[in-house]
Amino acid sequence: MNNLRYWIWFTQAIGYCTTKAKQLTFLYNSIEEFYLGGESEWRLSGLFNNKEIEKMSKIPLDISDEIIGKCITYFYDTVCIDSPEYPKCLFDIDDPPAVLYISGALPDIDDRMSIAVIGTRKASMYGIKSSYNMAYQLSKAGVTIISGGALGVDCSSHLGTLAADGVTICVLGCGINYDYLRENAKMRSDITFKGAVISEYPPDTEPKSYHFPQRNRIISALSDGILVIEAGSRSGSLITVNSALEQDASKKIFALAGPVDSHFDGSNKLIKNKVATMVTDYKDIIDAFDNVYVTTELDVSAQPSDDVIDVIPIKGKPPENINGLKTYDLSEVPQHKENLNLSEDEKSVYYAINYEPVHIDKISEITNLPVFKILPIITTLELRGLIKCVQGRSYRLI
């Protein structure tokens, strides 16, 4: 606890995503020794410029006390960079976090196979379904799933792991006590029963745009391999891949091949350029580590059904708990979303569909549009996550 106080002070003065915390662990017996050395010692270390030394001089040590009090009040755990419990795989990167704030219990990440499942927040239904199923299957094989707790691919991979009664780590780009994406609050709570929600930022820290690239280095460091589910050419997932390869050039990168369209430009390019290994099945990932980890045999009879997509949260709707999973009471959700920026034909097709399956011939009858015009519109609505195909050529709202 004593070291914690000094490490929190250090982060408040110097910030996050810095190489200097790790360097201090080699130069001093403790962070307390460094602090007590004062300005003269800080200069002698050769690590800090005048502006940083001035800031350390002005930041009082008791700035840490409120943060520690918050952790005690909400039963959050903390692990400092110089603690024996600090993950070795995280310490090994150039800029490991000085402090990790933890809700739940951090799994033994160094001795258990872990895969980061990443992708776009605006995932297609193919991406949502694939991330859920891959996380489910990998979890059944004993793999820890790591992701970022965002909407889309992150959320569905966490939920797939929970459905498999597996272990998952959610790495946030804000404080673990901040009400980030309220609709995912129940999911984050469920994660803590067998895994952990973690952050390098103090509990009440608001998310900033630059936090997420910083967060990505933690996701990549904690994982043995990275699975890219769906990424466009400018996706943040590519930042995670780059971070992983900068940390360890031999890090295994996997990607799910997708349609030849903008949603999968980044994923397909990783495969084309041989940065990532193409995967079509969870076993492709397991086999890549067969000389490193022993995994459990997957119970094939326990495969998730197509209905799993119904439990993926919708932005802005508070979650409920149904059979241990997170879903939404669709009876309370307006049948059709507003302000979707659809063309007139797209609106006609969208409003012809409801929560009961509607055949494409019926849609044609309602809209007075020929089927050949409806088909590309259907594809657009599916990619935007507004509808899904449920049987044959029938569709329903999501």
Where are the regions a protein language model picked out?
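Short, positively charged patches
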Residues: 1-129, 133-140
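Glycine-biased, small-residue-rich flexible motifs in mid-sequence functional cores and linkers
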Residues: 3, 80-398
